[in-house]
């Protein structure tokens, strides 16, 4: 049998989970890892966690990355770009972040970064709202940033590429991820990425992205400013990103999975 483990965030950051849920997840994941013939980890970071938390032999674990929908690599028509801008009432200039708006994703750092960026730079945050979202928006109101933040909770999946494409940068300040598919989506579209250090995001973003501490809003703003002020850098990051994501193509992933299953026959 083969089991795929996306992350062990419930052990790495237990404060984000209820005790009962942690206990159930720990039992299920540990048992699955012990009895599987092979384990697929979606990042080297997840592989290390499986070894560290469950004491699993590293040779039993294969790292096979994830990819994203092919539509993110397709050309976006001007008509689609205009339609999406109008439908979602997008600002002229913005950076984008995508993912459930929960505390682990660290939306507050992206909001705080606006304090150090030009007044015409906005933040578009795409994802399901949680109680944490309200907490962040209260902070935004205190800082006079409400008008520069655009929360989109119900975005059609096929509209995501155009939302990314209109952004000047994608920011992903999450404290911890198993991989980071939104980063792959953004690079496939062709926009620069600034992500957080501390988990697997360097694996997803590769050498062409910028990385900052998830606890340093000024550093996040400085990285975004580099992109805004250096068109050559922004273009180079976009090209490197498109090249890097080729390793996450469905052909590469399918080949790796087939090889893994063949090895067990």
Regions found by a protein language model. Name each.
Residues 1-265:
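Carbohydrate transferase catalytic cores enriched for Leloir-type hexosyltransferases
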